[in-house]
């Protein structure tokens, strides 16, 4: 079973480094210059894996844009729980629960697609 947080961390690093290639004009325009070098220096996934996850993210945006934006803020932009809590006027605990829900939805989509990712070798849990 894959560690969805590791998957999304690698996808987030890929998206941060390739934001001009990602066709999220509303996001890219709003966050231009806000992506820190800390986020950019993380390990990335390959383009093929990123496109699969981008497809899942597009579906999430269509059905629940709040959860999509939360994942982008956390994994691409690199916002902390506290900064997300301030942005959404709620507690950091609530942000954690919302992130878990969003991560679970993406994980479920990847399971339903039954596609092997190249990064599975690195991100699989050995439980």
Curated annotation (Swiss-Prot):
Keywords: DNA-binding, Transcription, Transcription antitermination, Transcription regulation. It comes from the Bacteria. GO terms for biological process: single-species biofilm formation; transcription antitermination. GO terms for molecular function: DNA binding. InterPro entries: Phage_933W_GpQ. The keyword Calcium does not apply. Coiled coil: none annotated. Encoded by the cryptic lambdoid prophage DLP12. Belongs to the phage antitermination Q type 1 family. Positively regulate expression of some phage genes. Bacterial host RNA polymerase modified by antitermination proteins transcribes through termination sites that otherwise prevent expression of the regulated genes. This is Prophage antitermination protein Q homolog QuuD. It comes from Escherichia coli (strain K12).
